[in-house]
Amino acid sequence: MSLKSETRVNTSTLQKIAADMSNLIENLDTRELHFEGEEVEYDASPGDPKAQEGCIPFSSIYNTQGFKEPNIQTYLSGCPIKAQVLEVERFTSTSRVPSINLYTIELTHGEFTWQVKRKFKHFQEFHRELLKYKAFIRIPIPTKRHTFRRQNVKEEPREMPSLPRSSENAIQEEQFFGRRKQLEDYLTKILKMPMYRNYHATTEFLDVSQLSFIHDLGPKGLEGMIMKRSGGHRIPGVNCCGHGRACYRWSKRWLIVKDSFLLYMKPDSGAIAFVLLVDKEFRVKVGRKETETKYGLRIDNLSRTLILKCNSYRHARWWGGAIEEFIRKHGADFLKDHRFGSYAALHENTLAKWYVNAKGYFEDIANAMEEASEEIFITDWWLSPEIFLKRPVVEGNRWRLDCILKRKAQQGVRIFIMLYKEVELALGINSEYSKRTLMRLHPNIKVMRHPDHVSSSVYLWAHHEKLVIIDQSVAFVGGIDLAYGRWDDNEHRLTDVGSVKRVTSGLSLGSLTAASVESMESLSLKDKHEFHKKEPISKIVDETDMKLKGIGKSRKFSKFSLYRQLHRHHLHNADSISSIDSTSSYFSHCRSHQNLIHGLKPHLKLFHPSSESEQGLTRHSTDTGSIRSVQTGVGELHGETRFWHGKDYCNFVFKDWVQLDKPFADFIDRYSTPRMPWHDIGSVVHGKAARDVARHFIQRWNFTKIMKPKYRSLSYPFLLPKSQATAHELRYQVPGAVPAKVQLLRSAADWSAGIKHHEESIHAAYIHVIENSKHYIYIENQFFISCADDKVVFNKVGDRIAQRILKAHREGQRYRVYIVIPLLPGFEGDISTGGGNALQAIMHFNYRTMCRGESSILEQLKPELGNKWINYISFCGLRTHAELEGNLVTELIYVHSKLLIADDNTVIIGSANINDRSMLGKRDSEMAVIVQDTETVPSVMDGKEYQAGRFARDLRLECFRLVLGYLSDPSEDLQDPVSDKFFKEIWVSTAARNATIYDKVFRCLPNDEVHNLIQLRDFINKPILAKEDALRAEEELRKIRGFLVQFPLYFLSEENLLPSVGTKEAIVPMEVWT
């Protein structure tokens, strides 16, 4: 045998002896051992560096360890534990069984106070455990855990406290006070000795754990070791054998009860194994009849039936009563039935803010993410990792979503993202790419996708809510995904080609002055257009590459070919920071060709000094665009940054997204096709309302973790809701928020959130607000599919609108309804040929709600109002125009909002469309917030003085000014939304005038002149003024004000727009469209 192998044998033998010795000592019976009078060991300072912080951070819930580990942090640093024996309960018996004394011990540790009940025999068992531990710690066993314990123990001369030896039965009634004092002193001394205080037997005796003293988890609740039975989960579509007793498995777990949830942990690993939220179905039952278990305890909520087993019936009764009492005291709000059937309570004095369009919304999300210290929760229907949250881009990649998340993850923030897992054949949002991209950024970023379509049998419904939650204290709720195409501002631009101007080669960067800037040779749109007609793209690209190889030598290099290359070349390097403005696409192209790098690099120079790396972008001092300069052999080219880069420049009616794994490559030609502007609404709430949003996210996350086996590993942790008791402690507050009454609403069901009864509180809130509105309602929505026939459509929103108008007419009341929806549904299709089948199907149900068929709003109104319905309700869309490459172009503005404003005092903002998918609860999952003003400002309503809510009125005015074109012109008074002057002379008149001008100039579709497909073919073949006479067209377009246009109610009114038999859309169930 070699020396090396002999050493290996000796080492393994030593390890075996050490393990045997450790097991022997752990199982040592020390009942006869008494080490009275001996010195004890004492550690004056905590060993865990985290303990120096003075409190246990909330993030420690993700770092729990096995209960017997020596270095876990259970207690608050530098904070003593005070023990007091409050009372003694004496249980007597007529039999020969000795009387039992039960001591109630109150413990205080910092802000936390709790009670435990112990018999004297428990003290004796506890004392023996400590004696065994003391003997064990003296033996130098060569194991890592034992060595750590010994190294962290310092000897100090102190006597080991001893328990009274006299029997409980020998104590007289008058001696109880003395016994209480003895036990109290014993505990006080033990708890002053870190060696014993941190021992797992002590923490179990005191009913404490690593999660006991975390401030944001609320008051110290009930804790203790129990036996837990497997099963009881409600997982839709899965029929497991959990109902047969043979399938049950019992496991030892540490149960923790908090103010709004309970959980249990695995003692050996410290892992949180399940979280059960308190809700209105929360019940605790005791007994064999209820639990089918001797000494059983049953806990129910909307998601699970949990069966526990105790040591005795009395123990089970105590657990049941204590849990109910604690939850009633600290979590009563979660047990109640709330308004609209919502899972969330109405919260007073809650800070809230609205957003019109994504510019401010994205900026505030970016700023809030920067302030995150513990957690970021995100859930979206679609998420694009490479989008920029702040634009124009002037700080490189700093505000790109994936870069923000990576930066925060590196700082220790835990990031949890849930994405809708689409049916890939039906949708091209490529959530797998999003997940893969985000997960590889950092281990602190966890992404789940749901649902699994086969196992859950969910093919038709989607997770549609859009939420961003920061530290469970600030929550963004609305209709805006963090995805391509969503960013927009109040200008709703149609074009984004940037601009390039050339300065003569004699000018140097240093000598560039205001005068020289004015003398730049500019490329007009017309010149560029003429050039594009003459030069094919392939020739330009080839010529540019050829000239670049000899840059600085040849003077034949064309400014046009460089311009073309700067603006039209597709990016190949998706990770390049430089891929985000008009000139940097050219740089990226050159970097991908190694033979050009060395020749070109000396000639590329930024006009402004950059704070980023070579790949970074320049900063600038204005908000209009980033001025760039490229030094070439033909002088200086100065450009303005783009707002939409690569896939972000989109027009999904013209063409749906493709190749999402190439984020900075254009997929439509921005020189010939205008983008589709995006109009949307968002909100942010703080405090208790934000806690409610986080609670919904946590419920969905934990449900998905249980349901999908791939997420059951410890790398995907269970999430815990923070306590409402600490919700007022805001570490960050979004600027501009105002106080109001706020309640969260949702659409949720078994498939989406794992709950027993579906919730449709958004639908109930819409109905309530419409029925109780007194003056007006203003609706912006992506869809308008309602008016129930109880066969195909079931939501009642449209019916309630019609009934409210009829009520106003009968009472002689002035009442207005404003409906703003997209002129066309957001599906790919050529409307000049009638549109695609999906587009037509949505058009059918929109028209069925508004004006076609006996169930429609107008058909419900006409029998009583005739044509006077026009005085009560207005249907509108949004449209804009621009010049693109020398041509006049127009495009609808896609209304994606989910907004309801009533009476300038109530607002609903969320992700829910007005259709059955969003409203019924059993279908798509949705989230919304209802805000009711408590702060008022003087206003006018129906010609009379009126106290309008600050939140609702300001939002309504912002929407009106935007769509009517009065954002920068306060000449018209928009205060009174009900008066005839506003409704007829401003709103209806502006919409009609704009629609007429657009029809005259562009012959827009949809159009009221077109009733069938034959008329449609004739309509599109007629000459268009914008092409025939551009000057006259421009003169007409100058009369346009704002974006508002009348909705064409009679477009294709003679056609059946439902999918034709034989098409794939006709095979799909009708519920998909409604």
Curated annotation (Swiss-Prot):
The protein's enzyme class: hydrolase
GO biological process assignments: defense response to Gram-positive bacterium; intracellular signal transduction; lipid catabolic process; phosphatidic acid biosynthetic process; phospholipid biosynthetic process
Database matches in Pfam families: PH (PF00169), PLDc (PF00614), PLDc_2 (PF13091), PX (PF00787)
EC code(s) of this entry: 3.1.4.4
Statement: the UniProt record of this protein carries the keyword Aminoacyl-tRNA synthetase: no
Expression across tissues: Expressed in kidney, lung, and at a much lower levels, in brain, liver, heart, testis and spleen.
Every PLD phosphodiesterase domain range: 459-486, 891-918
Reported disease: Defects in Pld1 may result in coa which is associated with coat color dilution and white spotting. It is also associated with platelet-storage pool deficiency characterized by decreased levels in serotonin and dense granules.
Protein name listed in UniProt: Phospholipase D1
Biological source species: Mus musculus (Mouse)
Organism phylogeny: Eukaryota, Metazoa, Chordata, Craniata, Vertebrata
Gene name for this UniProt entry: Pld1
